[in-house]
Amino acid sequence: MIGLLELELHLPEAQSLKDKRQPLRSILSRVRQDHNVSIAEVAHQDDWQRAGLAVVGVNTERVAMERTLDLILRAIEETPGVVCAGEQRQWL
């Protein structure tokens, strides 16, 4: 089962692309280290206070993949200075 999690993030404290980069790098690095998934910024690269992330993982069981995506979402939501403005999941 392939799980895709698309996230729309709001970074209200970012006043420049440099301000945006630090928390995003932290999120990308932490998710890659803690979970066996791929993650990338896929939208709003030139917007200071918005980011679109995509997370893709593979597992033999959908329930296990859902659990992993839930953990990732929770970790991102707990990141200081980052607000999750929307999420969408797809199963392939």
Where are the regions that the model predicts?
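Active-site-flanking beta-strand signature of metal-NTP-handling nucleotidyl enzymes
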Residues: I2-E8, V55
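C-terminal binding/interaction regions
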Residues: K20
